[in-house]
């Protein structure tokens, strides 16, 4: 008992404010703090899916499918020290679709490359997400009228986030990842293209 009293005596107001802030964050995620004496400050009870989504959103493993200049100018620049995509936990680019959570389609998708895009998407484990990066991946870009260009990767696979630009700036790429993170944490707020 003496230790608890000394602990509260040290700074009771700060501890209660911290507790209230923790409860507020947990309620925002849909969880409720467990009311079991002092354990309530460290344990939360809530939907398992919410906690899994929170973990997924903070440890995405992207797989780049660079088809044109967007892969070099936007994606690689976002991985450089100036923008540092690593600070968000997305720096480890995967070469295998079986190890990836996010497929980044960067550049023009031709009809010849389309089966490979679909095959890589199908090889990814669930849950899987797709980011279309650049005008060409989103809508075909300046090559949309060509006989050999697919007018947007969303004609082949469902896309979760669109990052416009030719090529998108690295900060736009980071913003796209943040939007995907928000979508994963709150799936009931934002629906996928195939769920509308």
From Swiss-Prot:
Pfam families: Oxidored_q6. Keywords: 4Fe-4S, Cell membrane, Iron, Iron-sulfur, Membrane, Metal-binding, NAD, Quinone, Translocase, Transport. It is found in: Cell membrane. It catalyses: a quinone + NADH + 5 H(+)(in) = a quinol + NAD(+) + 4 H(+)(out). Gene3D superfamilies: 3.40.50.12280. GO terms for molecular function: 4 iron, 4 sulfur cluster binding; iron ion binding; NADH dehydrogenase (ubiquinone) activity; NADH:ubiquinone reductase (non-electrogenic) activity; quinone binding. GO terms for cellular component: plasma membrane; respiratory chain complex I. It is a peripheral membrane protein. It comes from the Bacteria. It is an enzyme of class 7 (translocase). [4Fe-4S] cluster binds at residues 69-70, 136, 166. Its EC number is 7.1.1.-. Belongs to the complex I 20 kDa subunit family. This is NADH-quinone oxidoreductase subunit B. It comes from Desulforamulus reducens (strain ATCC BAA-1160 / DSM 100696 / MI-1). The gene is nuoB.
